[in-house]
Amino acid sequence: TGQNPYSTTGVAEAIVRALGREPVARQPFRDEASMQLAVRALAGEVDAARTALAAAPERHLPQLIGILGYYHAQAATNDAVRRRALTLMELAVPHVPQPRLALETARLQQQLGETAAARQTLEAVLQRHPEH
């Protein structure tokens, strides 16, 4: 329906195609590129998504990926959904300067029984933000 900013251009391009025309080639906007990475990560292409984000962080909004994971974690009713949320949060954390996402990631890792990963995440927060 084009209600989300990152889907508006895709809807517009679909309409152009439905009218028998070809949309002009363009680079995806940062929000679109971020959602494309999230889709890839959730489809099992985590390493490829991680590599793409690391190669061009300026073309993405890692905060958007991270908050998508955070909201999925908050709404999760089972561990399968929590793991999907964690995938997104872990993808974003290295690129989000605020410590809150990393702290929430560590909390979710611990909740899922990934104690070593939680400890590693917290240690990284302390290195980047010793005031915490």
PLM regions and their residue ranges:
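Active-site-adjacent pocket-lining segments in enzyme domains
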Residues: T1-T115, R119-E131
